[in-house]
Every structure is written in C-alpha cells, then in structure tokens.
C-alpha cells in the first residue's frame, strides 16, 4: 500500500511540474504596466520581469534629469509589484490543493 501511495505522489509531482512549466510559459506572455508621475512614465514588462517597453512623456525630457530618473525607477518598481501580484494570482490556482504554509512563495 505504501508503494501505491508513493507512486501516486510521484505522479502528482510530475503532473504539477508539467503544469508549472506551462504556467511559466503563460506568465512570459502576460504583460503588466507600471506607471509613475500620473502616467507620464510607463514601464511595460512581462510577469517574468522582462521589460518590453519604456514610455516617457515628451514633456519630461526638458525637466530635471534626477526627477526623470526617479520616475523611471518608480514606474519600474510599480511594474514589478504588478507582475508579482499577477504571478501569485495565477499560481494560487495551481497550489490551492497543496499543504503549503501561508505566504509561501514558489521559486518562480
């Protein structure tokens, strides 16, 4: 009986690994947009943290360089937070049946 349970667990683990791979491929296609300065700076990235686009309103180009750098950093950080939240939401469906501790983050 123990062998049967172990085989079942191994099969479950293999299926979950395949599902995780598919989910990673999907997350690589999902884009999120971070903004700062009331939308004057926008960073678009995938849920795998690959930046696709950076858009800067032309009105900022003549302004203070330090302020522009801060706005770009803030937009990037906003995009990262959105990517993490989207990834967590998508992954929660896959891990809902697993006995994981609260707040446990998978390493992807």
Curated annotation (Swiss-Prot):
Pfam families noted in UniProt: YbaB_DNA_bd (PF02575)
Localization, UniProt: Cytoplasm, Nucleoid
Molecular function GO labels: DNA binding
Gene3D superfamilies, alphabetized: Nucleoid-associated protein YbaB-like domain
Biased composition (Pro residues): 99-108
Record-annotated membrane-spanning stretches: none
InterPro entries reported in the protein's UniProt record: YbaB-like_sf, YbaB/EbfC
Keyword Cytoplasm: yes
Domain of life per record: Bacteria
Entry keywords, A to Z: Cytoplasm, DNA-binding
Comp. bias intervals (Polar residues): 85-95
Region (Disordered): 85-108
Example of a GO cellular component annotation carried by this entry: bacterial nucleoid
Function: Binds to DNA and alters its conformation. May be involved in regulation of gene expression, nucleoid organization and DNA protection.
Family designation: Belongs to the YbaB/EbfC family.
Oligomeric and partner information: Homodimer.
This protein's name: Nucleoid-associated protein Bcep1808_1753
Organism: Burkholderia vietnamiensis (strain G4 / LMG 22486)
